[in-house]
């Protein structure tokens, strides 16, 4: 069996006080978003199935030490919800993202990792009403920063903001 390529995930922030950084729900959700984007990317470029991807990430990467790097623990149910939701709804999400992109920049032309970020963010904006839209947009811009330069994170921000205003207009009129 071929060893999977090491996904890029953030290391935990330094300890502060008695609480471990990974103990906070927000940290576990942030780690889940990052892992979900990496999993979606891996599925997109490698053709892996969802069950194999879940098994690999949950057993090998998330919350484990790999090659001297400690990966953040992630909220497994949240990770699974994002990945399975994007896979299930991709045919609805992609046209939404396409509409939000600048003319002449179809989603197929966008780098695979940015497609994964936008799909995950769009899914969460549509289906996870328990999380404020501005938080979702900000979190996925942060995830994008882990992979790409500032110009591309600006595009992620613009696209997800437009989608947020479409699904959650009431949050922007307050």
UniProtKB/Swiss-Prot annotation:
Keyword Transcription listed: yes
Keyword annotations from UniProtKB, A to Z: RNA-binding, Transcription, Transcription antitermination, Transcription regulation
Domain of life: Bacteria
CC annotations in GO: cytosol
Region span, Disordered: 1-28
GO MF annotations, alphabetized: RNA binding
Stored Pfam families: NusB
GO term, biological process aspect, one: DNA-templated transcription termination
HAMAP family (alphabetical): NusB (MF_00073)
Role: Involved in transcription antitermination. Required for transcription of ribosomal RNA (rRNA) genes. Binds specifically to the boxA antiterminator sequence of the ribosomal RNA (rrn) operons.
PANTHER family hit by this protein: ANTITERMINATION NUSB DOMAIN-CONTAINING PROTEIN (PTHR11078:SF3), N UTILIZATION SUBSTANCE PROTEIN B-RELATED (PTHR11078)
Protein's name according to its UniProt entry: Transcription antitermination protein NusB
Organism: Rhodopseudomonas palustris (strain BisB5)
